[in-house]
């Protein structure tokens, strides 16, 4: 395959065009008055979004060289989204500014490597300033609501719903986003431990209106293998019948003979019982069964521990205040496990989360932690049309990520003001040579850009408002939503520190790589020859 090679100014100019194409499409979404972008889809209705990373991911340019520039800035948005969950548009705006001003300086003869060193030094200083400006969120649900609202483009409903969900499940809890079946957006909190396995037979149902089995104060038998024959569980069933309490059996599976006997006993009313399959698979199943055992104060009956079903005693069974089993889910409320044992299990899972390198494992461990320590809140997103619902779901997702980032590293004044306040830390800061100092100046100019862009998207003059904000101090800034200058912290216009930090670090990293590029290589497009004409038929005339 032949290659096309470009050098120096030619290469950088084409890369810059690609950067501008992508950044110009993304930056219109920034701020409370940012606009929507409509993305054509091969199947179904077009997608409407205000999510920067969603726009960036859709862009592929026909020119190979320009496309490389676009893909590099797409990487800025994607990495920022992966690390902080929000701030993708801000990162794109910062990258575009650093690249544009940087390339002008390279064209004027500045050394690209020195520029990059200056940029890196300035970014480290700005990050230091952001950390100084940062204020912890703690349990201030007002701040959590404000962060979520800003990230959801000023949607107060989303802000209050996320704050409500956080309040209910605490920091250790898990909040998931689902599509609502109606047009309402609401939060549903599952108290206690829920796992996605329902009753094995509908004959176990006690509430026929809801098709659920409700067990009050039941004993819970936890077994990690199949229960095939009745004689294995007969001793413990007889002991449970004597107590008069219901029983929940959690096992890998319950086969026909044992299941038929349980159903008959249930229908006769001699034993209120329900059987469900164990959640998870493989090693994860063992861990989840141990979690249930710790939560309910029971023991996992496992041959690995030398325990057999026929030898089970009442004190090996777990208990809970209530268990509700539907066709697909089981919820255990107020398990009788000891607080100290649950705390120890929670600490163990937290340690595993810190050590794991897999995103999937981390997510699953986080879910287990939530089920033990906090709870699970489901945020159901509804809208009149599917197109609007998907757009809203994108904003809810951003808001949730921003909220988690705020809890992690605190908050700074929003509206681009935190970056503007960081300019003072760069005043008088010099590099070891003129080009390094130019790199510092490039960052100094770039960190004004998010504020300017927010203002431009609100239909005002960016340069004028940026100058006014620079003249003031602390949290004073321009609220683009209301169109007035005010204390942004008091007005609730705040951003997560982590989002501001990660956006700048990623933007500077990719911009630095682009500025130090001297040669670009791409494949030559092959001209596909037109297919040969099919032979003409004689039409029967010879």
UniProtKB/Swiss-Prot annotation:
Residues annotated for ATP binding in this entry: 29-32, 50, 86-90, 415, 495
InterPro entries noted in UniProt: Chaperonin_Cpn60_CS (IPR018370), Cpn60/GroEL (IPR001844), Cpn60/GroEL/TCP-1 (IPR002423), GroEL-like_apical_dom_sf (IPR027409), GROEL-like_equatorial_sf (IPR027413), TCP-1-like_intermed_sf (IPR027410)
Name of the gene encoding the protein in the UniProt record: groEL
UniProt similarity note: Belongs to the chaperonin (HSP60) family.
Disulphide bonds in the chain: none
GO molecular function: ATP binding; ATP-dependent protein folding chaperone; isomerase activity; unfolded protein binding
Keyword Endoplasmic reticulum included in the entry's annotation: no
The keyword Chaperone is assigned to this record: yes
Enzyme class (EC, first level): isomerase
Listed EC numbers: 5.6.1.7
Keywords: ATP-binding, Chaperone, Cytoplasm, Isomerase, Nucleotide-binding
Any Gene Ontology CC annotation: cytoplasm
Listed name of the protein: Chaperonin GroEL
């Amino acid at each position: 395959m032949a290659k096309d090679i470009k050098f120096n100014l030619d290469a950088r100019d084409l890369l810059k065009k690609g950067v501008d194409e992508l950044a110009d499409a993304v930056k219109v979404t920034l701020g409370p008055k940012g606009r929507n972008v409509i993305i054509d889809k091969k199947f179904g209705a077009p997608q409407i979004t205000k999510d920067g990373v969603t726009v960036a991911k859709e862009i592929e340019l026909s020119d190979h060289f320009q496309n490389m520039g676009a893909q590099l800035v797409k990487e800025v948005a994607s990495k920022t989204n992966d690390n902080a969950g929000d701030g993708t548009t801000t990162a794109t705006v910062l990258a575009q500014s650093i690249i544009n001003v940087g390339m002008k300086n390279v064209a004027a003869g500045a050394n690209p490597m020195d520029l990059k060193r200056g940029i890196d030094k300035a970014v480290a200083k700005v990050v230091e300033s952001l950390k100084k400006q940062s204020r912890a969120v703690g349990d201030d649900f007002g701040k959590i609501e404000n962060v979520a609202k800003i990230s959801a483009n000023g949607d107060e409903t989303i802000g209050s719903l996320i704050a409500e969900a956080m309040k209910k499940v605490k920091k250790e809890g898990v909040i998931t986003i689902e599509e609502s079946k109606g047009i309402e957006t609401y939060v549903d909190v599952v108290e206690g431990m829920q796992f996605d396995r329902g009753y094995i037979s509908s004959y176990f149902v006690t509430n026929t209106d809801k098709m659920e089995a409700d067990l009050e104060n039941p004993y819970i038998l936890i077994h990690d293998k199949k229960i095939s024959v009745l004689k294995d569980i007969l001793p413990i069933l007889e002991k449970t019948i004597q107590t008069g309490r219901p029983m929940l059996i959690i096992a890998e599976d319950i086969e026909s003979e044992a299941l038929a006997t349980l159903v008959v006993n249930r229908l006769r009313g001699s034993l209120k019982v329900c059987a469900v399959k164990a959640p998870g698979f493989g090693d994860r199943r063992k861990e989840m069964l141990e979690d249930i055992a710790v939560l309910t104060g029971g023991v996992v009956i496992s041959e690995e521990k030398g325990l057999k079903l026929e030898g089970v005693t009442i004190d090996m069974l777990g208990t809970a205040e209530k268990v509700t089993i539907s066709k697909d889910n089981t919820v255990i409320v107020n398990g009788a496990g000891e607080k100290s044992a649950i705390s120890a299990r929670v600490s163990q899972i937290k340690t595993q989360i810190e050590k794991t390198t897999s995103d999937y494992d981390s997510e699953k461990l986080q879910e287990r932690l939530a089920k033990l320590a906090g709870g699970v809140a489901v945020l159901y997103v509804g809208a009149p049309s599917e197109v609007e619902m998907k757009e809203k779901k994108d904003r809810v997702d951003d808001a949730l990520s921003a909220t988690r980032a705020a809890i992690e590293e605190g908050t700074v004044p929003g509206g681009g003001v935190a970056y503007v306040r960081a300019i003072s830390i760069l005043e008088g800061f010099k590099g070891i040579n003129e080009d390094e100092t130019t790199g510092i100046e490039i960052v100094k100019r770039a960190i004004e850009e998010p504020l300017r862009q927010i203002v431009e998207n609100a239909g005002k003059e960016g340069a004028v408002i940026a100058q006014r904000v620079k003249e003031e101090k602390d949290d004073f800034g321009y609220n683009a939503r209301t169109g007035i200058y005010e204390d942004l912290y008091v007005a609730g216009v705040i951003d997560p520190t982590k989002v501001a930090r990660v956006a700048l670090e990623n933007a500077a990293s990719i911009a630095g790589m682009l500025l130090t590029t001297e040669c670009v290589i791409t494949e030559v497009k092959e001209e596909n020859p037109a297919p040969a004409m099919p032979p003409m038929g004689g039409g029967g005339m010879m």
